[in-house]
Amino acid sequence: MTWRDEIARRVRGEHLRDAPLAPRTAVRVGGPADLLCRPADGDALSALLGAVRELGVPLSVLGGGANTLVADAGVRGVVLRLPQDFPGESTDGDTLVLSAGAPIARLPARAHAHGLVGMEFLGGIPGTLGGAAAMNAGTRLGEMKDVVTRLELATADGAGFVPAAALGYAYRTCRLPPGAVVARVEVRLRPGDVAASEALMREDRERRRATQPLDRPTFGSTFTNPPGEYAGRLIEAVGLKGHRVGGAVWSPVHANFVTNLGGATARDVLALIRLARARVKERFGIALETEVRLMGEFPPDELAGLDGHAADGGGPGAASGGARPREAT
């Protein structure tokens, strides 16, 4: 019996072998996963985490595929993806407990259905809630740390809620314990004017359509903004706005967005990222940091010059590049 057979035997849920990952990411790039698993519920999730630990199988976590670059060679081991309808959602007054696999786009409307506001900033963010919570996703309207009160973290030994205050939330990051997976997210909102909230979200969507390349596959922002600066302005200033490598390009609409013009590879995308980091560092002395999570087996030459990048693709405590498993949006 192979390790894939053993995991399928132990873990209730969906198991897809050699599953293409490019269609499951926002930028539409990357190779297949050895095994893509969608556990049926919390017990099945803990069973999966226990199985990969016992069998020594690498584990990566994929949410909606935003801010994620999968290696051209794909991802060895298990890629975990929580179902959208993962059990355990609830509402109690101004507090909602939501599945980490829930698409972000539907959450403001759910809050509005209960007369609650405060999630307007999620209206323009792709991906899933778990990934957004794990990386403290946000926009000019707010960020996840403004509303998250607790995360339910699953491990091989079970699951439990951890207060947001214990997770070290900061700009586009939080500190998840090694080997933990976000299963559910608790948010606290406030009663408010739903019509005004919807109008604010419509206005923000129109602004994004006018200033971002939303007609092409893209991560969203590639680099975080340095203190007091904008990554897009720096990339444009070094002459890379519209610069193309293979099927990938620094968007002529917004220079901090890599877009896939068709047939782009992870190698193409990383070449653009390395070039931008090098030129900005040389001219401005600023080391740009990526928002993009790397998942899978990347050749060393593709990672050269990407010190400090976030890596996925290994197992609990031993992800690709030596990092722990992370939730990707």
Swiss-Prot record:
Signal peptide: none annotated. Its EC number is 1.3.1.98. GO terms for molecular function: FAD binding; UDP-N-acetylmuramate dehydrogenase activity. It catalyses: UDP-N-acetyl-alpha-D-muramate + NADP(+) = UDP-N-acetyl-3-O-(1-carboxyvinyl)-alpha-D-glucosamine + NADPH + H(+). Residues 204-225, 303-329 are annotated as: Disordered. Cell wall formation. This is UDP-N-acetylenolpyruvoylglucosamine reductase. It comes from Anaeromyxobacter dehalogenans (strain 2CP-C).
